[in-house]
Amino acid sequence: MKASHAVWEHSGNAKAPHVQLRNGHCTDGFIDTLQYLSSTANLVFATEAMAVKLTAKLGGRQADWAFGSPMAGIPFATLVGVKMGIPRVGFTEKTGNNKDQICRFDMLPGTVFLDIEEMTTSGETPQRLINAIMKKNPGAESLPFIGALLIRCERRPSALLGKEIVPLVDLPELGVKYNEWGADCPLCAKGSRVITNAKKVWFDLLRTMQDPMHVISEAEYAESR
């Protein structure tokens, strides 16, 4: 993923900015799976590998729908669903509140669906997808597991309410640990500024690993903690 320019890690220099995650925590490292999956070769490779793992996990059972959450999860879930032979693919949409999701697809009672994410940090995003689908289709059935290209949390995070994540890349299992902090963030304490729109200024952010003084003109910053 580093070869795909998908990995940012804070240099340790307080003059360089760091990143705020969607859950509001600060972090000293982040992997933007968008950059990795934008390569069609990577997308095909990851799709095939994910389909193999999820098909094995299903154990002969068939899902009726594959769903992806906005935005990067949609093409990944769609291609994995096609590879698995799942008859229908869908997605949720964000509302005015950046965290809320809605589902516009109607499903018959008893319809089984599988959530496939490109990444999850805590399990909150896939749970919001599941909630949105079940609100629209209370008779549908969510499988007891989801797929994910990459996770930086445990495989049964509390936010996912008991469901298991089947990942391709499990950062904790690989020993890759990026710190997360709340109000006690040591980088904030040292004067490092917090970028809230990292994905929108990604390549500028990568430059700060070598040049901590690099100016990111379109960065949005959180208030100092």
Question: What are the residue ranges of the model-derived segments?
Answer:
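Short, well-ordered alpha-helices that flank and scaffold nucleotide-derived cofactor binding pockets
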Residues: 52, 56, 82, 131, ...
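PRPP-dependent phosphoribosyltransferase catalytic core
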Residues: 1-3, 130-225
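Residue-level preference for short coil/turn positions at secondary-structure junctions
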Residues: 62, 108-110, 181
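Conserved acidic residues
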Residues: 64, 111-113, 144
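Short glycine-rich phosphate-binding loop at a beta-alpha junction
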Residues: 60-70
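Short hydrophobic segments within beta-strands
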Residues: 69, 116, 147-149
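Active-site-facing substrate-recognition patch
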Residues: 1-59, 200-203, 207-225
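Short, glycine/charge-rich flexible loops or terminal/linker lids adjacent to PRPP-binding catalytic cores
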Residues: 71-117, 121-128
